[in-house]
From Swiss-Prot:
Localization terms from the record: Cytoplasm
Gene: argB
GO-annotated molecular function: acetylglutamate kinase activity; ATP binding
Cellular component per GO, a single term: cytoplasm
InterPro entries: AceGlu_kinase-like_sf (IPR036393), AcgluKinase_fam (IPR004662), ArgB (IPR037528), Asp/Glu/Uridylate_kinase (IPR001048), Glu/AcGlu_kinase (IPR001057), NAGK-C (IPR041727)
Protein name per UniProt: Acetylglutamate kinase
EC number(s) given by UniProt: 2.7.2.8
Cited function: Catalyzes the ATP-dependent phosphorylation of N-acetyl-L-glutamate.
The protein's annotated pathway: Amino-acid biosynthesis; L-arginine biosynthesis; N(2)-acetyl-L-ornithine from L-glutamate: step 2/4
Keyword terms, alphabetized: Amino-acid biosynthesis, Arginine biosynthesis, ATP-binding, Cytoplasm, Kinase, Nucleotide-binding, Transferase
Length: 293
């Protein structure tokens, strides 16, 4: 079934159901981490861009934080550079960082900005290096109980919220590539999941949405019957050690955002067309909702 096959009455019911959520979110910031298949499938990319324009025209303030893992990996392969992951994070040498900067801002960010701007002059591409938007602090990861160095990888230590709010006040949609200098000016690669959480916390966002390539959070992956629709931060912290490595940054991001005051974080299936609108404006939603304990 598509929207074209719905009866006029059914379409009206869909719009009426959205009213409650439109009222709740009007004038509020929603931070969306854009990644996974939604970045590589043309239909999903265009649907995501349309969703951002829809939010903007409903008086909601979307802020997009994007990754670029598949594109970085592809470019590293073309250049003959070996890549590695530890604890769900990309090991970033100076050589890998150069590629990440080129791909994140020069390719992925530009493509998304152009797709959104096909609907109007809304999107502005920035990195954490612009206007001192982010300040990074270097991080390690825990691998089998051992703190492990992963190179030029950081967490967001500070967000220049005023700079982002200036863009929002100008009715723009910030599209953020996750690169940021530390206090000494050394640029780091920032995981987009953890960066999105820092942005949501700093802006006092109403919601944080994480796009993934699965239906949501599973308590016992790959058992699909273990999908949870809602979980609180206490239960999620207990679940964290058992999660698949690639899900760890997303869960860490959800925990940071919700414990930092964001009312809810949502891990949603980015393979679903218009997944952002489904999650925000329908009673059923899609994926897993994380709330405070």
């Amino acid at each position: 079934m598509t929207i074209e096959t719905l009866s006029t009455q059914s379409k009206a019911q869909v719009l009426a159901e959205a009213l409650r959520w439109l009222k709740q979110l009007h004038g509020r910031v929603v931070v969306i981490k854009y990644g996974g298949n939604a970045m590589t499938d043309d239909t999903l990319r265009q649907a995501f861009a349309a969703d951002m324009a829809f939010l903007r025209n409903c008086g909601i303030h979307p802020v997009v934080v994007h990754g670029g893992g598949p594109q970085i990996t592809a470019m590293l392969g073309k250049l003959g550079i070996e890549g590695d992951f530890k604890g769900g994070f990309r090991v970033t040498t100076p050589e890998v960082l150069d590629v990440a900067r080129m791909v994140l801002f020069g390719q992925v960010g530009r493509e998304l900005v152009n797709l959104i701007n096909a609907h109007g002059p809304y999107a502005v591409g920035v990195t954490g290096e612009d206007a001192q938007l982010f300040t990074a602090v270097r991080r390690s990861v825990n691998v089998d109980g051992v703190a492990t160095d992963i190179g030029l990888v950081g967490d967001v230590d500070h967000v220049n919220a005023a700079a982002l709010m200036d863009l929002i006040a100008a009715h723009r949609i910030p599209v953020i590539s996750t690169l940021a200098p530390d206090a000494e000016g050394v640029v780091h690669n920032i995981n987009a999941d953890t960066a999105a959480a820092a942005v949501a916390e700093a802006l006092g966002a109403e919601k944080l949405l994480m796009l993934t390539d699965v239906e949501g959070l599973y308590t016992s992956w790959p058992d699909r019957d273990s999908l949870v629709r809602e979980i609180d931060t206490a239960a999620l912290e207990q679940l964290l050690p058992r999660l698949e490595a690639g899900m760890i940054p997303k869960v860490e991001g959800c925990l940071r955002a919700v414990t930092g005051g964001v009312p809810s974080a949502h891990v949603i299936d980015g393979r679903v067309e218009h997944c952002v609108l489904v999650e925000l404006f329908t009673n059923a939603g899609t994926g897993t909702k994380v709330v405070s304990a």
